[in-house]
């Protein structure tokens, strides 16, 4: 069987280890069956004013969001999800005014604690960016601690009670939070679809490597247009 340059067949070995197949050959591409509206949900990750708004803590991430068109693309995809009857679930980072219940056991959380902006529930800082609403039928799941949204929240039972088997993961950042969300979803048996134009991280060259070598092994990577088309079939 002919081979293309730079690819390996299953069972090939390098230095005695079994090589992986190219990512594109290992992930499902039948989006019609993977993304049936009755069994899929759109998850947004920390698309909040204090995270990706104009005065957010990490300017480089805000710039990446702007460059990618994430807010516009995700706002449009959320509208298509609602129109198709697909639940939209917003995962929010929240903090009490006194910081109670939130640890600083890693550098990322410690940086957040030192910020003058407090993500108090109901505050403008904790609010979703305008492109995402929320609309009355949306779900909002907050967490006081940690860097990803499944642990210690209602996210898992909400999805299971809605009959969801595939989650479409969007938001920020590909560096940490989205990665935690994707891994936890896989651990819980969900299929994961990742629209590349609805996620962002920094720096760009690292994001490209993450998508190819990490997310490509965990999720079906597509565009928001492909997701919307599958929901409209």
Where are these regions (language model features)?
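Short glycine-enriched, charge-decorated loop/helix-capping segments at active-site entrances
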Residues: 57-67
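Von Willebrand factor
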Residues: 73, 77-100
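Aromatic- and acidic-residue-enriched segments that line the glycan-binding/catalytic groove
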Residues: 99-113
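N-terminal nucleotide-binding beta1-loop-alpha1 segment
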Residues: 43-47
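Short, solvent-exposed loop/turn and secondary-structure capping segments
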Residues: 54-55, 101
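Active-site-adjacent betaalpha module
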Residues: 2-41, 76-84, 109-233
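Nucleic-acid-processing active sites and adjacent nucleic-acid-binding tracks
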Residues: 70
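Short acidic, Gly/Ser-rich segments with clustered Asp/Glu that frequently serve as metal-coordination loops
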Residues: 48-53
